[in-house]
Amino acid sequence: MAELSLAELREIMRQSLGEDEVPDLADADTVTFEDLGLDSLAVLETVNHIERTYGVKLPEEELAEVRTPHSMLIFVNERLRAAA
């Protein structure tokens, strides 16, 4: 079973930002995507990348509550376990 790691999420977020700078996720449980410079479009690009890479559907209506990298990890990994 595949699982999304914090390092993988960090790289996907860097790609979504379109920058060489990698976001610092030291406080992944409290820092928001907005604090990291990701607007809603960048978060959507991150979600789309995860869906393509991991072959999992992440329902948009449930994503509204996902505001931090840590909550994204939990959200994605729960879906991956359910799909296994």
Curated annotation (Swiss-Prot):
Residues recorded with modification O-(pantetheine 4'-phosphoryl)serine: S40
Keywords: Antibiotic biosynthesis, Phosphopantetheine, Phosphoprotein
UniProt name for this protein: Anthracycline acyl carrier protein DpsG
UniProt source species: Streptomyces peucetius
Pfam families in the record: PP-binding (PF00550)
Top-level taxon: Bacteria
Function: Involved in the biosynthesis of aklanonate which is an important precursor common to the formation of the clinically significant anthracyclines such as carminomycin, daunorubicin (daunomycin), rhodomycin, aclacinomycin T (aklavin) and aclacinomycin A (aclarubicin). These compounds are aromatic polyketide antibiotics that exhibit high cytotoxicity and are widely applied in the chemotherapy of a variety of cancers.
Biochemical pathway: Antibiotic biosynthesis; daunorubicin biosynthesis; Antibiotic biosynthesis; carminomycin biosynthesis; Antibiotic biosynthesis; rhodomycin biosynthesis; Antibiotic biosynthesis; aclacinomycin biosynthesis
Biological process, per Gene Ontology: daunorubicin biosynthetic process
Ranges where the Carrier domain occurs: 3-80
One GO MF term attached to the UniProt entry: phosphopantetheine binding
Cited Gene3D superfamilies: ACP-like
